């Protein structure tokens, strides 16, 4: 297509929106898609990739889809601080969930970095950063893949975005396909504390259509519509935080030319700062977590669709063999960690917590919640309660990994970064195992 204009963005948005609706129709009508809980946004991205300029060339999609994904991730992170409120739960159980999740995240990053540098790059001419496309896509999903890929692109390694997006797409499919297999095996072997046999998926989860009696509000109307729409206020707040994030990122680059802080991480910092300041005022009473969560979900749907549709098939083909080895070895490592560590760290409901963690360690939080809904339909494990609190400590580490990894790897310190992740991950796991034995 020609030069970029505002209508170029409108056309891209319209096409992707149409594909999301097609994806939703496919999810509702086709049992195979329902069985594996494939999100409409993923279907939209795959269709857009197949029909777009990278493959068949039937859709007039521009070459800006990857840029849109990079912008949308800033909106997701800007809204993140406002999507939940924190409280206190049983400290010991929250601590175990934190250690299990944080240790696993660090070890997955260490594994990807080390296998890329010490094994794959010795066989193929690869950049040091090749290996971390696996944890960026698996543990972080399409959001983190877009974030880290955009950061690497700004530093001259544009292929990382495609590799990480491919990893995220493979991960989200494996999270459900293998997750359901693990669930059936575990139930048959008596690991489950909540099920006696593998349960079938509720229709609401399969089709994604919520029955009229089960529908919940996507937010509260905190302003009178005669003054300003509640959605307008929350969207304006999110956009303002993204602007602050952009200015902070550009300002940091001017003050320290070697420092390239991604806009998304600066937006998260800006959001956390604003939230911290506003908690002392009555403004906090007019920020609705459900509304911010709904907006974040919308941004994420478009992020996933744009991200997958922007995958460069030529790059995937160029790296197909080492990428396949990386992703398969990552699945094996994650499987071993998830189930072996859970069995030794958690005193009760270890299998349910492992199934949930498998979902988000390879796919997304939504995949983990879907698997947990099957494994623990009555929420007896309180897994989500503990994880919600633990994530307050996990999130800063995750954002730090995504923020600083591109700068460190492109400067040739990838091995040091991976070894630090390994040491920290093993330290957390050792502490949790010792603590678990003492508290028996």
PLM regions: where:
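Structural signature of hydrophobic alpha-helical transmembrane segments
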Residues: 4-18, 62-76, 130-135, 258-270, ...
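Hydrophobic transmembrane alpha-helices of secondary-active transporters
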Residues: 19, 45-52, 65-93, 269-278, ...
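Interfacial helix-loop-helix linkers and transmembrane-helix boundary segments
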Residues: 30-37, 58-66, 83-100, 280-293, ...
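Alpha-helical membrane segments and immediately flanking helix-loop junctions
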Residues: 103, 115, 123-159, 163, ...
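C-terminal transmembrane helix pair
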Residues: 306, 313, 327-436
């Amino acid at each position: 297509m020609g030069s970029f204009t505002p209508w170029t963005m409108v056309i891209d948005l319209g096409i992707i929106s149409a594909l999301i609706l097609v994806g939703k129709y496919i999810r509702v009508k086709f049992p195979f898609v329902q069985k594996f809980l494939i999100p409409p946004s993923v279907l939209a991205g795959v269709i857009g990739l197949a029909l777009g300029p990278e493959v068949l060339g039937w859709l007039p999609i521009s070459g800006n889809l990857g840029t849109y994904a990079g912008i949308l991730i800033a909106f997701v992170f800007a809204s993140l601080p406002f999507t939940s409120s924190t409280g206190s739960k049983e400290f010991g159980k929250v601590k175990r969930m934190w250690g299990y999740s944080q240790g696993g995240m660090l070890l997955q990053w260490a594994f990807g970095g080390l296998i890329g540098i010490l094994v794959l790059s010795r066989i193929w001419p690869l950049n040091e950063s090749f290996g971390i496309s696996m944890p960026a896509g698996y543990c972080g999903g399409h959001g983190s893949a877009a974030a880290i890929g955009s950061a690497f692109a700004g530093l001259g390694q544009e292929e990382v975005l495609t590799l990480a997006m491919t990893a995220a797409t493979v991960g989200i499919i494996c999270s459900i396909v293998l997750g359901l297999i693990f669930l059936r095996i575990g139930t048959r072997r008596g690991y489950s504390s909540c099920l006696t046999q593998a349960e079938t998926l509720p229709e609401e989860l399969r089709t994604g259509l919520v029955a009229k009696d089960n529908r919940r509000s996507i937010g509260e109307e905190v302003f009178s519509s005669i003054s300003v729409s509640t959605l307008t206020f929350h969207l304006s707040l999110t956009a303002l935080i993204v602007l602050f994030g952009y200015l902070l990122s550009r300002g940091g680059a001017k003050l320290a030319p070697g420092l390239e802080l991604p806009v998304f991480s600066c937006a998260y910092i800006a959001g956390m700062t604003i939230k911290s300041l506003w908690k002392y005022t009555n403004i906090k009473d007019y920020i609705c977590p459900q509304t911010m969560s709904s907006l974040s979900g919308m941004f994420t749907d478009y992020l996933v669709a744009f991200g997958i549709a922007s995958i460069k098939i030529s790059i995937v083909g160029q790296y197909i063999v080492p990428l396949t080895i990386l992703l398969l070895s990552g699945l094996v490592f994650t499987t071993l960690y998830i189930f072996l560590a859970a069995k030794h760290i958690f005193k009760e409901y270890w299998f349910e917590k492992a199934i949930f963690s498998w979902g988000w360690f390879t796919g997304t939080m939504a995949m983990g919640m879907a698997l947990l809904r099957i494994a623990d339909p009555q929420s007896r494990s309180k897994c989500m309660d503990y994880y919600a609190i633990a994530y307050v400590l996990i999130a800063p580490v995750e954002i730090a990994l995504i923020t600083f990894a591109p700068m460190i790897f492109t400067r040739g310190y990838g091995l040091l970064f991976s070894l630090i992740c390994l040491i920290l991950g093993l330290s957390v796991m050792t502490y949790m195992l010792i603590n678990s034995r003492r508290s028996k």
